[in-house]
């Protein structure tokens, strides 16, 4: 009775407003009826899609005659579902980690070594994969930041002050000393390139450095290198560290470029040098990056990519680093070394599947170079660091670096260290912005 009354009321309303019918062509009641029909058809289509999907998951021999007829009547749905299945399988295969057998890897490394020797201007591009050996998680690996977030799990990391430059970091520094590498373009914020002894003029840390804070009120900007993670209180779009400039008293800020932000600082980002290196390079050795947009991906030229696991997607694009305006004959060759698929595989002259440290060890052996060992006593961060002023000791709670592991760091005051995981201010910040949180009931 209620529905009939509603219909009569709708008809009366439609008759009372002929202007509306003339203007729109349909009465309000007719539009509502058409909308109900549309929704009903959509629900029927979804239910049919679910039925077809359940049938396709069965073995052919297990399908009934009625189910066979339903599939025959739903060719479009079958084609769509089979296409979805192929795409899912393709994505799974791309996420799988594949290793070349030892003999094949050595053969490929010999070819890579030849490319390094013959390069006129070699630029190294690095991502999170080169730091996994230092117990710093990557982003897309099995235990990476993005992977854990997608599973709804929390992100944690070991105390980053315990991280030290890896074999790959030290190999890059050696290659630069031997004038085989001209510049390093890095997406990493962990400061391990700086601590490996690589000159600051020879690197561009495009996403910042966790050990550096700056005063943007001073001209030029005044840098403060610290022996602790300065990002404890910072986050996406919130960069003040809580300390002040020794000269002008303005608030200091970190140098981290989070996902969705655009880096504007001169140093340590050093974009000018990165762009110049990209335009001059004929070879790029890329370690630890997925080369997936919208990450920094490769810098315009030959990319020799040694990547264990992919890196975060912090900024959307770096088109001016690609130099794709050059004719194909002038573009550099592409060499990729990665355990996983990358979107640049088809462009590569050679694809190697291997871990960064493993490949770099073989490469340095092939080049006849000895890999220097990292020493905290020779870590340049201690000579570059600006000590905290009196009264600033309590401005952070992160463990400070020290030359000896037994020596208490500056500002630690001998306080006992917590065994709980420590999460750096920059690590994972901005990643959680787009994750869905489960409602607590």
Q: Each predicted region: which residue ranges?
A:
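Conserved catalytic core of sirtuin-type NAD+-dependent deacylases
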Residues: 2-441
């Amino acid at each position: 009775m209620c529905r009939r009354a509603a219909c009569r009321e709708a008809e009366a309303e439609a008759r009372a407003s002929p202007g509306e019918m003339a203007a729109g062509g349909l009465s309000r009641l007719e539009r509502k009826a058409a909308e109900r029909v549309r929704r009903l058809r959509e629900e029927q289509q979804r239910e049919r899609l679910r039925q077809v999907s359940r049938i396709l998951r069965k073995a052919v021999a297990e399908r009934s005659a009625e189910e066979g007829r339903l599939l025959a009547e739903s060719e479009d749905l079958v084609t769509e579902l089979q296409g979805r299945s192929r795409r899912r399988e393709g994505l799974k295969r791309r996420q799988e980690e594949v290793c070349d057998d030892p003999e094949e890897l050595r053969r490929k490394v010999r070819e890579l070594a030849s490319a390094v020797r013959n390069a006129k201007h070699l630029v190294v591009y690095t991502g999170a994969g080169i730091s996994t050996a230092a117990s710093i998680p990557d982003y897309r690996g099995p235990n990476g930041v993005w992977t854990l977030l997608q599973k709804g799990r929390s992100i944690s990391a070991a105390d980053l002050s315990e991280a030290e430059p890896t074999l790959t970091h030290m190999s890059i520094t050696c290659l630069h000393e031997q004038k085989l590498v001209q510049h390093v373009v890095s997406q990493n914020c962990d400061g391990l390139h700086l601590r490996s002894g690589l000159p600051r003029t020879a690197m561009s840390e495009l996403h910042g450095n966790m050990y550096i804070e700056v005063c943007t009120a001073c001209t030029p900007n005044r840098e403060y290198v610290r022996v602790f993670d300065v990002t404890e209180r910072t986050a996406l779009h919130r960069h003040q560290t809580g300390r002040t400039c020794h000269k002008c008293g303005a608030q200091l800020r970190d140098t981290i470029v989070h996902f969705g932000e655009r880096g504007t600082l001169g140093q340590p980002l050093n974009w000018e040098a990165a762009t110049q290196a990209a335009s001059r390079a004929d070879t790029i050795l890329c370690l630890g990056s997925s080369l997936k947009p919208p990450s920094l991906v490769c810098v315009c030229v030959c990319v020799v990519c040694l990547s264990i696991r992919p890196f975060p997607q912090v900024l959307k694009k770096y088109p001016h680093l690609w130099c794709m305006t050059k004719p194909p004959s002038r573009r550099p060759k592409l060499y990729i070394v990665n355990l996983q698929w990358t979107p640049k595989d088809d462009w590569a002259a050679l694809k190697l599947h291997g871990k960064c440290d493993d490949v770099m060890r073989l490469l340095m052996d092939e080049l006849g170079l000895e890999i220097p060992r990292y020493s905290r006593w020779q870590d340049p961060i201690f000579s570059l660091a600006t000590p905290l002023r009196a009264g600033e000791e309590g401005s952070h709670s992160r463990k400070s670096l020290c030359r000896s592991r037994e020596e208490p760091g500056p500002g630690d005051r001998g306080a006992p260290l917590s065994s709980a995981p420590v999460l750096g201010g920059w690590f994972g910040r901005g990643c959680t912005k787009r994750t869905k949180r489960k409602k607590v009931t």
